[in-house]
């Protein structure tokens, strides 16, 4: 198992500086992570920095509330891709989901999938705000809309990924859709627990610490 290729090396805090982004980019190249996940304003910088590497550029859309309209999310997606984004992590319309307005939730995700072309789309369901039934419904709608992944969390709400949520999401979507655990993996042990529960990608700001733990254990 190549643990490094499970990791989306992430820096999304609003106060992030260019120097901090450049540090994350250098680390991502050193460890050959799956991707770097940055806010849209840093996508062009990341794309230029990573152009000669295998590391993908991931960004966030409708972030962190998910409460923009489908048209705005679609525009954000196209803009991000034009700047060099390879992967799109979009926040679901959480309020519409909890209201039971599933048509809007579906339209919202479909708008981003359509705007993304052949780029990878991960749908952030913000599991900490949902009941288990709502988590299942969010995963089903994401699958129906043609997204590639479901993702647990933004990291900006009341909690991050849990092993139980990852397991439920994997059970719901089956083997043919990705599951990303985000906002909860701070150590090698955390990462392995999420992978064993069904995660195919891990979003973490502590990717280097996770890998250093893996090196200490000699198993990655």
From Swiss-Prot:
One of its GO terms (molecular function) is deoxyribose-phosphate aldolase activity. CDD domains: DeoC. Disulfide bonds: none annotated. The keyword Protein biosynthesis does not apply. It comes from the Bacteria. One of its GO terms (cellular component) is cytoplasm. It catalyses: 2-deoxy-D-ribose 5-phosphate = D-glyceraldehyde 3-phosphate + acetaldehyde. Its EC number is 4.1.2.4. One of its GO terms (biological process) is deoxyribonucleotide catabolic process. Pathway: Carbohydrate degradation; 2-deoxy-D-ribose 1-phosphate degradation; D-glyceraldehyde 3-phosphate and acetaldehyde from 2-deoxy-alpha-D-ribose 1-phosphate: step 2/2. InterPro entries: Aldolase_TIM, DeoC, DeoC/FbaB/LacD_aldolase, DeoC_typeI. Catalyzes a reversible aldol reaction between acetaldehyde and D-glyceraldehyde 3-phosphate to generate 2-deoxy-D-ribose 5-phosphate. Belongs to the DeoC/FbaB aldolase family. DeoC type 1 subfamily. This is Deoxyribose-phosphate aldolase. The lineage of its organism: Bacteria, Bacillati, Bacillota, Bacilli, Lactobacillales.
């Amino acid at each position: 198992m190549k643990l490094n290729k499970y990791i989306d090396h992430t820096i999304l805090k609003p106060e992030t500086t260019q120097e901090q982004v450049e540090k994350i980019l250098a680390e991502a190249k050193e460890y050959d992570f799956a991707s770097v996940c940055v806010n849209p304003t840093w996508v062009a910088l990341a794309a230029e920095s990573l152009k000669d590497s295998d590391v993908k550029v991931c960004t966030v859309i409708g972030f962190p509330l998910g409460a923009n309209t489908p048209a705005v999310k679609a525009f954000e997606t196209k803009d991000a891709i034009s700047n060099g984004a390879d992967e799109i992590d979009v926040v679901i319309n959480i309020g519409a989901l909890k209201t039971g307005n599933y048509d809007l939730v579906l339209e919202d995700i479909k708008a981003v999938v359509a705007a993304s072309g052949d780029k990878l789309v991960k749908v952030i369901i913000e599991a900490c705000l949902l009941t288990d039934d709502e988590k299942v419904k969010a995963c089903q709608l994401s699958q129906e809309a043609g997204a590639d992944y479901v993702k647990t969390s933004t990291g900006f709400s009341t909690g991050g990924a849990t092993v139980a949520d990852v397991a439920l999401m994997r059970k719901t979507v089956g083997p043919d859709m990705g599951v990303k655990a985000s906002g909860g993996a701070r150590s090698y042990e955390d990462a392995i627990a999420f992978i064993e529960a069904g995660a195919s990608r891990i979003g973490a700001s502590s990717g280097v610490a996770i890998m250093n733990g893996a090196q200490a254990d000699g198993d990655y």
